[in-house]
Amino acid sequence: MKRLIVVAGPMGVGKTTACRELHRRLPRSAFLDGDWCWDLHPFTVNAQTKAMVLDNICHLLNNFLRCDACESIIFCWVIPEQAILDAILARLDLRGVGLHCFALVAEAEVLRERLRRDVECGLRDEDVILRSLAYLGKYASLDVDRLDVRAMSPAEVAAELARRCGCPVSDVEAQPNRISAGASTENA
């Protein structure tokens, strides 16, 4: 049975890193980071761009769900509200698909420190810290399985996600890297 693994959480909690690790470990998997579907410069939030990102996400996820080469589809994005998750899931063809939804969370101080390091390395803007901390409490009300990642490595998070999704142990062995949405297909 195909599985869709949705991973939500505030910026900086480790969604992308953990999902990349999970993607690397699961055979026949596809990985989509919702941020790739809204990569605008300057970043613009309005009704049109909100509709665009949902269209982009749902189009790509449905293509992965229809593709026989994909057994596990991993999707991560901030998703701070149940309405956003519901809007995405309502537009997907989930017949015959096992759905597994998670939120990665951590204590505010842990999240602040992770983001501070990213800011110091030039990976994020300073304002992300307050925005991410403001989102943190919203994940308590999502109808998802929560995973506190404050003391976990990305590999440990990936292994726990796989376990909670019921992936057989043999499925969780490290696999060679493969192309994901947003990656170059030059040598594919």
Per-region residue spans from a language model:
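Hydrophobic anchor at the beta1->P-loop junction of P-loop NTPases
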Residues: 7
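P-loop (Walker A) phosphate-binding loop of NTP-binding proteins
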Residues: 10
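Glycine-rich phosphate-binding loop used to anchor ATP phosphates in small-molecule kinases
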Residues: 52-96
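Conserved phosphate-donor/acceptor-positioning beta-strand/loop module used by diverse small-molecule
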Residues: 95-115
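Small-molecule kinase domains that catalyze NTP-dependent phosphoryl transfer to phosphate-bearing small molecules
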Residues: 117-160, 167-188
